[in-house]
């Protein structure tokens, strides 16, 4: 049983000196990722294009094996878990929102085949997508065209997030998944996700400092290495890379009130 193998004293997730080199690549994509995450934390991951943000979160569900080091989930090396066991605990929302031809209901069932209507509506509400579905003829049974072409980019992203949330995952990974949302919807989505924090550990990859500034821990990546780690205020004080990102987005706040 899984419960027998869980180390209650261990951090929920523990990256121990993890490096990743893709097959055929000369240089490592990630080098010496070393950090712990508590259950229920929200972790923001920020950095420039090509800094390794997506590669880092793709290690958690085991999409790629670490080249060096180990990743422990409640004290267990994730390499000792089957894909089904590991990925059954994780909801991933990739950068590109993907919807399948069918209905809204059938798309949500990809996340959880036996989901009840109540669970579906709860997930839609958290993902700020309930109004979208409510406004469609047939509601949950409304048609979804191939690739969700009959929905806007922001609507597709919200429905994809709902599909990840319907399974009530222990770990939720949002990989730049709110980039097509306006700031108000993005803020509402983040507030809703914070209500899950008791049991859901959330990783948010974003180019926007505003999206991750309230995270419990922010990991700043630069060229595959950790350039800084801490909360928003700590990083704004001590991390040059974070300062550059933040002030490039909020130039009026340089030297002023944050």
Which sequence ranges carry the predicted segments?
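ABC-type nucleotide-binding domain
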Residues: 4-258
């Amino acid at each position: 049983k899984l419960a027998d193998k869980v180390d209650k004293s261990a951090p929920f997730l523990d990256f121990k000196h993890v490096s990743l080199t893709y097959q055929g690549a000369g240089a490592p994509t990630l080098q010496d990722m070393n950090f712990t995450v508590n259950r229920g934390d929200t972790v923001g991951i920020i950095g420039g294009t090509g800094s390794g943000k997506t590669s880092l979160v793709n290690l958690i569900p085991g999409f790629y094996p670490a080249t060096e080091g180990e990743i422990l989930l409640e004290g267990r090396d994730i390499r000792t878990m089957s894909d089904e066991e590991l990925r059954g605990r994780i909801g991933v929302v990739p950068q590109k929102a993907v919807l399948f031809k069918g209905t809204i209901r059938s798309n949500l069932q990809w996340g959880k085949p036996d989901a009840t209507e109540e669970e579906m509506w709860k997930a839609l509400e958290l993902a700020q997508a309930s109004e979208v579905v409510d406004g469609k003829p047939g509601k949950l049974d409304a048609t979804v065209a191939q690739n969700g072409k009959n929905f806007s980019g922001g609507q597709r992203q919200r429905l994809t997030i709902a599909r990840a949330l319907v399974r009530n995952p222990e770990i939720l990974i949002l990989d730049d998944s709110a980039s097509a949302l306006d700031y108000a919807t993005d803020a509402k989505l983040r507030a809703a996700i914070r209500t899950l924090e008791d049991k859901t550990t959330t990783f948010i990859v974003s180019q926007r400092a505003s999206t991750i500034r309230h995270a419990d821990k922010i990991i700043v990546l630069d060229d595959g290495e950790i350039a800084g780690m801490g909360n928003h205020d700590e990083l704004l004080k001590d991390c040059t890379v974070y300062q550059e990102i933040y002030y490039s987005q909020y130039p009026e706040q340089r030297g002023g009130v944050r």
